[in-house]
């Protein structure tokens, strides 16, 4: 559980939101801070992309899927593992989806 702006936000044992509808950009900043990340424009681009992906496909992207989809939309410079790991050092798919208020990707350990 997470306390944000005086409200209890239900999370799983790893800190992923149980209800994606509770997410807001302000909450994303708080989740990112808990992960040791200060969100830059580049982080927001990935976080918003992951949310759009989830809304379209009803699943959080695993790393391979995330890299490929990012490359298709933003080009090879941003659609590669090195770029994404620089932004999300504990795992791009795991951290980006957590900050985006989405369920943990199925293939993430």
UniProtKB/Swiss-Prot annotation:
GO terms for cellular component: cytoplasm
Keyword Cytoplasm attributed: yes
Active site, per annotation: 108
Keyword list, A-Z: Cytoplasm, Transferase, tRNA processing
The keyword Membrane appears for this protein: no
Known EC number: 2.8.1.-
Compartments reported by the entry: Cytoplasm
Highest taxon of source: Bacteria
InterPro entries in UniProt: DsrC-like_C, DsrC-like_dom_sf, DsrC-like_N, DsrC/TusE
Residue ranges of the TM segments: none
GO molecular function, one term: sulfur carrier activity
GO BP annotations listed: tRNA wobble position uridine thiolation
Main location: cytoplasm
NCBIfam families the record matches: dsrC_tusE_dsvC (TIGR03342), PRK11508.1 (NF008562)
Subunit structure: Interacts with the TusBCD complex. Interacts with MnmA.
Family: Belongs to the DsrC/TusE family.
Functional description taken from the UniProt entry: Part of a sulfur-relay system required for 2-thiolation of 5-methylaminomethyl-2-thiouridine (mnm(5)s(2)U) at tRNA wobble positions. Could accept sulfur from TusD.
Protein name: Sulfurtransferase TusE
């Amino acid at each position: 559980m997470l306390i944000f702006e005086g409200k209890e936000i239900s999370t799983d044992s790893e800190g992923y939101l149980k209800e994606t509808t509770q997410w807001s950009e302000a909450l994303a900043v708080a989740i990112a801070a808990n992960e040791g990340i200060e969100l830059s424009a580049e982080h927001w681009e990935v976080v918003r992309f992951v949310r759009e992906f989830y809304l379209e496909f009803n699943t959080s992207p695993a790393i391979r899927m995330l890299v490929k989809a990012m490359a298709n939309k933003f080009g090879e410079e941003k659609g590669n593992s090195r770029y994404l790991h620089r932004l999300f050092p504990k795992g791009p798919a795991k951290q980006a989806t957590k900050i985006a208020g989405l369920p943990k990707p199925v293939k993430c350990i």
